[in-house]
Amino acid sequence: MKSKKNIVLVGMMGAGKSSIGKLLSKKIGLDFVDIDKLIEKIEDKTIVEIFRISGEKYFRDLEEKISIGKLKNTNQVIALGGGAYLNRNIRKQTLAQSTSFWLNWSPSTLIKRIKDNKKRPLVLNLKINEIKKLIDERAKIYISSDYKINCDKLSKFEIVKKIKDIYEDS
């Protein structure tokens, strides 16, 4: 493996960043960092509780601080939260020091995965057309990642292999 860069997984909530990240880190022998799980551990609260008690701004500020801190390290697989890559500072740090992969799914697949999930504070009270709009808006930013992986017709293991092959060739 030539690269010492991090692998950073970006994409919508429900895209599989955490599950793909865990599999990928085992496959290539790098540490795995799930930013949302790390935030929950530090705060001793779920993401939903943080949003409810402290608000989205507090969460986003904390997410930026923790994400940028982790992105400065090397040789990790990092799963960013669904909204983290929208933050210009996180995106800039990611693109400067990491190889980023957008786990892209069709809106219909993502909607099926997230619409009834109580752990997703941003979509808890949204209608399907509002979720679709959120997906479309975020896609305009996710596209700036280094690589786009179209996941709909791939198994988790095929996604992992694709990322591994690209990373090892970079």
Model regions: which residues?
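Short glycine-rich anion-binding loops that position phosphate/pyrophosphate groups of nucleotides
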Residues: 82-85, 106-108, 154
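Walker A/P-loop
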Residues: 18
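ATP-dependent small-molecule kinase phosphotransfer cores
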Residues: 31, 35-95, 120, 128, ...
